[in-house]
């Protein structure tokens, strides 16, 4: 299983003091040097953490795989085509939310999505869609032409009892299996940490996990190098 590191909250910490440090690009390079297979950043419409210049510098620096999380807007489409990350992940976005709160409503926005992703793919960029682990959403992602789905693991991360965790894990496992049967590659992310990630090692269909907050929080205490290596030891 591969690890993609989200560096958004390095930028959050930097922006708290309107400073130049810590630098998300430096964090990304350290993550790559210590085994991360990809770097994730979310250029939100309000630019609350990652800024346009961060994205430009990340594109210059990242040597593995750059995943640009973004809303399905014309502005972001143009930015993606100009910047050319290896991958974009379409996510829902609300200005009042602290973090992404749920999967992309692919059923509601299906027709727009089909038109939206073609110019991106024509530019040589793969498309992933952040969705709930539900068969109908997966089916729509496949028929729209996406290459990848990222399964929303937020509800799983909030479960408390073993029974609740197992129920949600089975839901994710079933969704991952179905997605692979439809020819999609599968990523998982949101709310995963150094403890609740462990059962995901048994879901062979999930090729990568995307982790941000938990890893950056640990990096604040032990350093980015150690935080990345610790996570890689757990997932592999």
Swiss-Prot record:
The active site is at 42 (proton acceptor), 69 (proton acceptor), 190 (proton donor). GO terms for biological process: pyridoxine biosynthetic process. Keywords: Cytoplasm, Pyridoxine biosynthesis, Transferase. SUPFAM superfamilies: Pyridoxine 5'-phosphate synthase. InterPro entries: Aldolase_TIM, PyrdxlP_synth_PdxJ, Pyridoxine-5'_phos_synth. It is an enzyme of class 2 (transferase). CDD domains: PNPsynthase. It is found in: Cytoplasm. GO terms for molecular function: pyridoxine 5'-phosphate synthase activity. 1-deoxy-D-xylulose 5-phosphate binds at residues 8-9, 44, 49, 99. Disulfide bonds: none annotated. Transmembrane segments: none annotated. Homooctamer; tetramer of dimers. NCBIfam families: pdxJ (TIGR00559), PRK05265.1-3 (NF003625), PRK05265.1-5 (NF003627). Belongs to the PNP synthase family. This is Pyridoxine 5'-phosphate synthase. It comes from Prosthecochloris aestuarii (strain DSM 271 / SK 413).
